[in-house]
A protein has these predicted regions:
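N-terminal Rossmann-like FAD-binding beta1-loop-alpha1 element of flavoenzymes
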Residues: 2-27
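Active-site substrate-recognition segment that forms the wall
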Residues: 17-21, 47, 78-79, 177-287
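Glycine-rich FAD pyrophosphate-binding loop
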Residues: 20-40
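Dinucleotide-binding Rossmann-like beta1-alpha1 core, especially the glycine-rich loop
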Residues: 44-117
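Short beta-strand to alpha-helix junction loop
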Residues: 55-65, 87-94, 129-145, 240-244, ...
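Helical element adjacent to the flavin cofactor pocket in flavoenzyme catalytic cores
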Residues: 129-166, 170, 174
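C-terminal catalytic lobe of FAD-dependent flavoproteins
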Residues: 263-334
Length: 334
């Protein structure tokens, strides 16, 4: 069986990986000449199902828990399993209790325990939540690593050139926000981020700063570099970061550690995340085309589960008529 995967974002590459492991022949096409630099490129890369459960459906936790092991296997050495630290300014301590009431998988930590986890935050926060079972990765390194591994597994990539779908037995469409307008109910949610560089701060894990209006996070990358994100704005505009978002990011970083005030802003970016009305992804099939889309802010967390479901679709022996226009609904039942 010959399968075409459309898209080289996280959904496309994870789908290609799961499919090729079933023994089928996989080819990947990308409309751009270079691998996708859409929402996946600007992602936080937090593999944090318990933290995300605070504001997401139970399916995000249920299906996201396997993501750490999946990424560890697919991209060896890139997953950092140091957990997540959630903190809040003293005036917003009630936000910690609210956050804790909506999820699980954490333990309360006091000022001394926070200092033990993150020495550079010693004396800055009186209490917090520590999620030991979570992790993170650098999305850009993960995408590059997965692309290279797929090449070694015999997957062919077609970049920036039209490809005839007719010779393929199945097509797996993972085109993300590019499919908005072509897939019913799919919308775009803008996310903004920036990168800071400073040798004065060291963090071992993502730090989430709670705020009543806009909670933000700081994710360590290579030594001395940090990704700060991310907004969720109901628009499909992928223009430059707004002044308001920039100020909120910088204020949040300064609240975590004052040394960020002297950090260099080395990059800003925006991406449009594809999302359905309930903010849950779905895997659907129409004829011989399977659609993977709607990951919203959970691309790296939920793409492995979506990819596995797509591979199951391909391997099923149901007749074409039985599969036409079928929607799995697994995401909304979990």
């Amino acid at each position: 069986m010959r399968i075409l995967v459309k898209g080289t974002g996280v959904a496309g590459l994870t789908a290609a990986f799961e499919l090729v492991r079933t023994g089928v022949t996989v080819e990947v096409c990308e409309r751009n000449a270079e691998p996708s630099r859409g929402a996946s490129w600007y992602a936080g890369g937090m593999l944090a199902p318990w933290c995300e459960r605070e504001s997401a459906e139970a399916a995000v936790l249920t299906l996201g828990q396997a993501a750490l092991d999946w990424w560890d296997e697919a991209t060896p050495g890139l997953v950092v399993r140091h957990g997540t630290l959630v903190v809040a300014p003293a005036r917003d301590k009630v936000e910690l209790s609210r956050f804790a009431s909506r999820t699980a998988g954490y333990r309360w930590v006091d000022e001394g325990e926070i200092a033990a986890l993150e020495p550079d935050l010693a004396g800055r926060f009186r209490s917090g939540l520590y999620f030991p079972g979570e992790g993170h990765l650098d999305p850009r390194l993960a995408l590059k690593s997965l692309h290279e591994r797929l090449c070694t597994m015999g997957v062919r990539f077609h970049m920036g050139i039209p490809l005839d779908e007719e010779p393929f037995d199945r097509v797996v469409d993972c085109t993300g926000s590019a499919a908005i307008g072509g897939i019913s109910d799919l919308r775009g949610v803008r996310g903004e981020m920036l990168y800071l560089a400073t040798p004065e701060v060291s963090l071992s894990r993502p730090v989430r700063l709670l705020h009543p209006r806009i909670p933000l996070y700081i994710v360590p990358r290579e030594p001395g570099r940090f990704m700060v994100g991310a907004t969720m704005i109901e628009t499909e505009d992928a223009g430059a970061i707004s002044a308001r978002s920039m100020m909120e990011f910088l204020n949040a970083a300064y609240a975590v550690h004052p040394a960020f005030a002297e950090a260099e802003i080395i990059e800003t970016g925006t991406g449009v995340r594809p999302a359905y009305p309930d903010n849950l992804p779905d895997v659907t099939q129409d004829g011989r085309t399977i659609f993977i889309n709607g990951a919203h802010r959970h691309g790296f967390l939920l793409s492995p589960a979506m990819a596995r479901q797509a591979a199951e679709f391909v391997c099923q022996t149901l007749s074409q008529k039985e599969r036409d226009h079928e929607t799995s609904g697994e995401w909304r039942r979990a």
